[in-house]
Curated annotation (Swiss-Prot):
The protein's assembly and partners: In plastids the minimal PEP RNA polymerase catalytic core is composed of four subunits: alpha, beta, beta', and beta''. When a (nuclear-encoded) sigma factor is associated with the core the holoenzyme is formed, which can initiate transcription.
Full protein name: DNA-directed RNA polymerase subunit beta'
Cofactor binding summary note: Binds 1 Mg(2+) ion per subunit. Binds 1 Zn(2+) ion per subunit.
Name of the encoding gene: rpoC1
GO annotation, cellular component aspect: chloroplast; DNA-directed RNA polymerase complex; mitochondrion
GO molecular function, one term: zinc ion binding
Chain positions recorded as Zn(2+) binding sites: 69, 71, 87, 90
One example of a Gene Ontology biological process annotation: DNA-templated transcription
Superkingdom of the source species: Eukaryota
Keyword entries, A-Z: Chloroplast, DNA-directed RNA polymerase, Magnesium, Metal-binding, Nucleotidyltransferase, Plastid, Transcription, Transferase, Zinc
Pfam families, A to Z: RNA_pol_Rpb1_1, RNA_pol_Rpb1_2
Amino acid sequence: MIDRYKHQQLRIGSVSPQQISAWATKILPNGEIVGEVTKPYTFHYKTNKPEKDGLFCERIFGPIKSGICACGNYRVIGDEKEDPKFCEQCGVEFVDSRIRRYQMGYIKLACPVTHVWYLKRLPSYIANLLDKPLKELEGLVYCDFSFARPITKKPTFLRLRGLFEYEIQSWKYSIPLFFTTQGFDTFRNREISTGAGAIREQLADLDLRIIIENSLVEWEELGEEGHTGNEWEDRKVGRRKDFLVRRVELAKHFIRTNIEPEWMVLCLLPVLPPELRPIIQIDGGKLMSSDINELYRRVIYRNNTLTDLLTTSRSTPGELVMCQEKLVQEAVDTLLDNGIRGQPMRDGHNKVYKSFSDVIEGKEGRFRETLLGKRVDYSGRSVIVVGPSLSLHRCGLPREIAIELFQTFVIRGLIRQHLASNIGVAKSKIREKEPIVWEILQEVMQGHPVLLNRAPTLHRLGIQAFQPVLVEGRAICLHPLVCKGFNADFDGDQMAVHVPLSLEAQVEARLLMFSHMNLLSPAIGDPISVPTQDMLIGLYVLTSGNHRGICVNRYNPCNRRNYQNQKRSDNSHYKYTKEPFFSNSYDAIGAYRQKRINLDSPLWLRWRLDQRVIASRETPIEVHYESLGTFYEIYGHYLIVRSLKKQILFIYIRTTVGHIALYREIEEAIQGFSRAYSSGT
């Protein structure tokens, strides 16, 4: 359905036989009503044309080629002067062939058939409304037993013999033998009921409002009883109360949606449009057909056989009629959901037929693959890799993907700058990958965000906006802090990239969907852009230097790996390697890049004269005096250089290159935030 705002919506539910007939029936210009599929044939083996009244009939579903009828006559579509609008010889309308994608047909069933979704799927809606065990209803549907009709003030065959409902099982094989087909049909319609028709009668007699009232009264009575002390009885009461709640909710849903319970039993079976169950020709002249066509043929064969038994044959035993009704029910079950009753139906190659349920459900079904996950223009897909040098709101887009996504914008830029005279020349420049193309692409991408999506999109953070930058390679680069929102990692995950085209979509992406504006979880409000996995390991490596002070390094001989102690060959004690001094962090990082020190090697870094570094009442571990009168006071984690007059000249802190790098990153982030805040105010 489409509402007034043109939002397309899809609702799945039960429909009435009248609605099915309205969908599938059409009236030809000569007044003839068509829509019923009566023959199980598809194409004629000689003419290779659809059979009349078959599963691909052009009278029912429309012409295969636009404006051409089954006879080969041609009419201009939409020309009002052309008359008639259909072929009087074959009855095919001169319309567009796309009608075969949505024009339905129907099969008029010779007996009512229960919809297997409502009977066998758990919870069973039919069993819930009728308040009967599912096994009992299955036996009734598949003609394993019958029940007596409540006929008052009339003598009946069953009542004269004193039979009751539970005794009819013994008459299953004996009663039909006394009647012909016509006589048994009269007897059954009068006194007994079985099959899906019995279910339909019971559902039609239900009053949903009375069901709600009675269920609420029973629920209150069970609640007043309280606990009995018997665990088994208490569980039984609890299960019954849960059942009553589900029954009330189901009845309210039927009332709210104007659905009648008897619609769960089918009298008319819809036939899908031919284009949704095609027969195609492959190499070698062989034909490939959708499995649904074979399942439809099975239903039509059995339904036609039952129709012949009920109308033409008068000497057929009633038991054969009941068996044929069971076969029709099983054929419809297989069409709707193959394998739901046990062993699935297979073809000659032992391959399971794909039923209607198999076509629409699952990851490769019609909804998730074709409707929800369909391919769209201005989109791409690639593997994600980590981009540690990216900002939080940026993503790295490979050149190959970027030039395809923004090709129309690049063409417009080339023409506007008079670098190309037309679209063809612009495309040739793009194919040749001239340098000017990448310059224009950079300009286009600067003001155009892109959307990254990782399936499954379970919450709103599954799709976020980023500012793209060109990167080499063929993988999308992503900042590691946004991975938690996507539930992504870098072990081969793929992400889709989309380009918002309209101005409204770009504004929405900038104001609502940018990654740096989605730092908190929308569900619980906790921070979601937090370090995980590789980032935690990296932080550990950066800060895994000396945590125990100078004493351990200098005097503990076992700690020679981290602090580069070397064993002398002439005696049994260790040589201490002097820890280097650096006047600033740039010199320390430069020494690391030159491989003069390791990432976790301890060093002395000159620090600003901050009294907070100096611990009060702490005595130095060592004091080193120099010839000029200055001396060094060495403490556990810092060092003070004093003058001859004991004035503090310098302070050195004991740290590692990893700590320095982490501190610089934090300091730059704070300074950037301060600048942004000051400019904003």
